[in-house]
Amino acid sequence: MEADGQSWSGESVSGPGPGGGGMIRELCRGFGRYRRYLGRLRQNLRETQKFFRDIKCSHSHSCPSSPAGGGAAELGPAGDVAAAPLPAGQLSCISFPPMEEKYLQQIVDHLPCILILGQDCNAKCQLLNLLLAVRVLPTLKLDSDESCKLRRLRFTYGTRTQVSLALPGQYELVHTLASHQDNWETIPEEDLEVQEDSEDTARVLADLEVTMHHALLQEVDIVVAPCHSHRPAVDVLSDLANDFLPVITYALHKDELSERDEQELQEIRKYFSFPVFFFKVPTLEIIRSSSGRADSERSPLSGQLMDLGYLSSSHRNCMASDQDCRAQSMLVEQSEKLRQLSTFSHQLLQTRLVDAAKALNAVHSHCLDIFINQAFDMQRDLQITPKRLEYTRKKENELYESLMNIANRKQEEMKDMIVETLNTMKEELLDDAANMEFKDVIVPENGETVGTREIKSCIRQIQELIISRLNQAVANKLISSVDYLRESFVGTLERCLQSLEKSQDVSVHITSNYLKQILNAAYHVEVTFHSGSSVTRMLWEQIKQIIQRITWVNPPTITLEWKRKVAQEAIDSLSASKLAKSICSQFRTRLNSSHEAFAASLRQLEAGHSGRLEKTEDLWLKVRKDHAPRLARLSLESRSLQDVLLHRKPKLGQELGRGQYGVVYLCDNWGGHFPCALKSVVPPDEKHWNDLALEFHYMRSLPKHERLVDLHGSVIDYNYGGGSSVAVLLIMERLHRDLYTGLKAGLSLETRLQIALDVVEGIRFLHSQGLVHRDIKLKNVLLDKQNRAKITDLGFCKPEAMMSGSIVGTPIHMAPELFTGKYDNSVDVYAFGILFWYICSGSIKLPEAFERCASKDHLWNNVRRGTRPERLPVFDEECWQLMEACWDGDPSKRPLLGIVQPILRSIMDRLCKCDSERPSRGLDDST
C-alpha cells in the first residue's frame, strides 16, 4: 500500500491533459447537490410512508403489530404496512399506490455511480485517470485488447488508500497482492488482471476494490468495467443498475466505432434507457497538436452515434443552452472539454430528482384532494342527516293523519260502495256459487242426501266464496282513495328513507317496510269472519238458523238450486253498514299498528345514525385538524423541491412591503417569469406551517383566473436568515400597486366601479371552487398598470368543509358571525360590502363609527351590536342600498354575488353615462 491518509485530489496527471481540479470541483458540487436533495426526498418519502401507515392504523379495525408484539408496525417490501385493508368508509381510498411507492423507494435507495465503459481497457483506464486527475491505472501496457484480462475495478472513498480483492456484495478475499509488497504510484498491472489459470474461482470472479482519500470519491463511486472477454458490458450495467444509478461514460480512442462497439452499444440501448457520455480520450498526437476538429464539423463518430440513436442533431445545443432540458447522450471529442461531464451528470441527476419529486407530489396532491372532497361529504352528511330524519318523521305523520281521515270519513261512502258492489255482483256471485265445486265433500250424483257435517262444510265454502269476492271488489275500489298520496309525498319520503338506511344494515330496512304497511293498509282490507267481529256474529247466527232447520227437517239434496238458495240467503243477511264499520275499524287498527311500529323503527334508525354521525364528526375533525394539514405540508415540501430543482432558489430584491406573517420582496426573474414578487414566510409554529401548506395547495390547485394573482411556485429556504430559521418563499405575479395605494393616489369613478366588479368576479370564482377567502380588504386587492383588480393573499382562504370556525380576518371587514365560529362564504359578501364603502367614498379614511373605537375588542363588540359605516353625502342611493344589503347582520339576507354583479354593472352604466353627460348627482369623482 502507498500514501495512507494522503489526499489524491491535489495531484495532477503527469504531462499535459484535460483533467484537473476545476472539473473535479464541478463534479463534486453536482454530486454533492444531488445527495443533498436526495436526502430531502428520502425524508419526505419516509414521512409520507409513515403518514399512510398512521392512516391505516387509525382507521382499521385493528392495528398491525410486529411479530414480537412490539410497537413498530411490520413493513412490506416497499415500506408499506402489511396490514388488513381499511374498512369500507370515507377514507378507505387513501393509500400509497404500490407502483409509485416502489418507484420512489428505488430512487432514494440507488445512489449514483460513475460507470466507465469503452472501446478497450486502455481507453477506460485513461479516462479514470483523467477523472481523478491522478495516474492511478497503467495505460501504456494495456494496449492489446486480445491479451487484456482487466477485472472489474471499483473506486470508493476512504481515509486510507487500500487495494483488495472482494466478491461483489459479499466479502473481501485474503490474498497478497503486488501492491501490498512495495510502494507504488500506479496500481501494478498483475493486480488488475484476472488470473484465469487460477484454481481459486473466487479470485477469478472478484473485483479489485480501491479506496482513496479523494474529493470526487467522497461524493460518488467509480466503477471501471472489465474487459469484453471477461464480461459483456450489458451484464455489468445490469448488475450495477440493481443497486445504483449509473452515470455511464464511454471512453473512445479511435476515430470510428468498430463492429463490436456498435453491437455493444445497440445491446445497451435495447435493454436500458440511460443516456451515455461519450468521450474521446486524448492520444499523444492530439495532446501535441494545437488544432482540433471544429465543433460544427460532423465527425464519423458523431454520425455513427446518430445512426445508433444515441445522438440527435440538437443534442449539442440542448446541452449548451438549456440546463432544464432532459438528459441526453453527449459526444465530446475535444479532450479539453471533459468538464462537460459535469453538465451531463447534472442533467441526468436533476431529471431523476425532478421526476421523483413530481411523482411524490402527485401522490400528495391526489390524496389531499380526496381528503378535501371527503370533508365536504362528511360535512354534508352531518348537516343533512338530522334534517332527513326530521323530514321523515314529519311526512310520515302527515301520511298517517291523511289515511286516518280517509278511514273516518269514508265509512258512509264505503257502505254505499258495498251495497252497490253487492247489487252489481249478485247474479255473478249466485252463478259462481251454483257452479261451485266443493272441496273435501263428496256429493252423491244420484241426488241422495248428505249428513249435517257435509252440509255445514258446503255452507262455509259458499260463504268463503262470497266473502273473498266481496273482499277483492271492496279493496280494489278503496285503492283509488289513497293513490293520490303516493303522488303527493310518499315517493319523496321513500327516497329519503332509502338514503338514511344506506348507511345502516342493508338486511334490516324495517322502517321502509312499516312505511309500506301504512300506505298499503287499504290494499289489504280483509272482510273475514274472525272471532269477535260483528260480521262474524251476524253470519254465524244465520248459519245456526240454517243448521236448526236442517235438524228438524229432512236433510236437503245438494243441487244447483240449493247452492243458489244458500248463497242468496247469505247475501241477503249481510249488513252493508256493519261491513263498512268493520272494514274501517280494521283499517284504523292496521294503520295505528304500522304507525307505532314506524315511529319505534325511526327512533332506532335515529339512534344508529347518532352514533355514526358522532364518529363521522370525529373523523371530520381529524381530517381538518390532522390528516389534511400534515399531508399538505409534505405536499408543499415535495413541490418546493421540484421548483428549486428546476428553477433554483430565487434572488431577493428590494423589500416591497411587510405583512403580519411575512415580507414581500422584488424578484426580477424566476422560472421564466419576470418581474415577480416574492413573499417570504417564516412559520412560527406547526399550526402556521400547516395553514401555509394548505393555502399553497389551494392556490396551486386553482385554475388560472384573470381576477386572481398567479402563484408561480415555492421554494423552502432551509438557511433563511443565515441558517437561523426555515422560510417558505412564495413566488407570485408582480402587480403595480394595491387598492389602498390606488385610492390614496386617487382613482376615477369608472375605474373604482370596474375594480368593484373585478373583485366580485374574483370572489365568485373562489366560491365556485368551494373556497372562502375570509380576508377581503383593500391591501389584498392588487391593481395592474391598467387599474384592473386581482385578489391576492389566500392565507385565510379555505374550503367551507375545512373551516374550523377560527376567528380570522381584518377587524373592520369581519362579519359578526365570524365571532361565533359558525359561518359560510357569505362572510366574503359582508367584507365586500365594507370594501365597496371605501370604493364609493374614493378615500382610505376609516368610517367614523370604526375610527371612534379605541381597541380591536371595542370594534368587534360594536360590529356584533350592529355598528356599520355611515352613509356619506357622495353616495348614490342604489350604491348605499347595495352596501347595506351586503353587510346585513343576518347572513341569509345578504345577496348572492351572482345578484350583486349585474347590479354593479347597471350602477356603472348609469353613473358613468350620467357622469359623461352632466355632473353626477351622487358619487363624485375623487381625482
Swiss-Prot record:
Tissue note: Expressed in many regions of the adult brain.
Q: What is its EC number?
A: 2.7.12.1
Q: List the disulfide bonds.
A: none
Report the protein name in the record.
Dual serine/threonine and tyrosine protein kinase
Known catalysed reaction(s)? L-seryl-[protein] + ATP = O-phospho-L-seryl-[protein] + ADP + H(+); L-threonyl-[protein] + ATP = O-phospho-L-threonyl-[protein] + ADP + H(+); L-tyrosyl-[protein] + ATP = O-phospho-L-tyrosyl-[protein] + ADP + H(+)
The gene designation is Dstyk
State where the protein is found. Answer: Cytoplasm; Cell membrane; Apical cell membrane; Basolateral cell membrane
Q: Name the domain of life.
A: Eukaryota
Provide the binding site for ATP: L656, G657, R658, G659, Q660, Y661, G662, V663, V664, K679
**GO CC annotation:** anchoring junction; apical plasma membrane; basolateral plasma membrane; cytoplasm
Coiled-coil ranges (or none): 393-429
Bias regions of kind Polar residues — which residues?
1-12
Which SMART domains does UniProt cross-reference here?
Answer: S_TKc (SM00220)
Q: Which UniProt keywords apply?
A: ATP-binding, Cell junction, Cell membrane, Coiled coil, Cytoplasm, Kinase, Membrane, Nucleotide-binding, Serine/threonine-protein kinase, Transferase, Tyrosine-protein kinase
As for what it does, the entry says: Acts as a positive regulator of ERK phosphorylation downstream of fibroblast growth factor-receptor activation. Involved in the regulation of both caspase-dependent apoptosis and caspase-independent cell death. In the skin, it plays a predominant role in suppressing caspase-dependent apoptosis in response to UV stress in a range of dermal cell types.
**Gene Ontology terms for molecular function:** ATP binding; protein serine kinase activity; protein serine/threonine kinase activity; protein serine/threonine/tyrosine kinase activity; protein tyrosine kinase activity
User: Gene3D superfamilies per the record?
Assistant: Transferase(Phosphotransferase) domain 1
Q: Which GO terms describe its biological process?
A: cellular response to fibroblast growth factor stimulus; negative regulation of apoptotic process; positive regulation of ERK1 and ERK2 cascade; positive regulation of fibroblast growth factor receptor signaling pathway; positive regulation of kinase activity
Q: Which residues form the Protein kinase domain?
A: 650-904
Residue ranges of the region described as Disordered: 1-21
Q: Which residues form the active site?
A: D775 (proton acceptor)
The protein's matches in PROSITE patterns, at most eight in alphabetical order, are given as: PROTEIN_KINASE_ATP, PROTEIN_KINASE_DOM, PROTEIN_KINASE_ST
Spell out the family assignment given in the record's similarity comment.
Belongs to the protein kinase superfamily. Ser/Thr protein kinase family.
The enzyme's main class, written as a single word, is: transferase
CDD domains from the xrefs?
A: PKc_Dusty (cd13975)
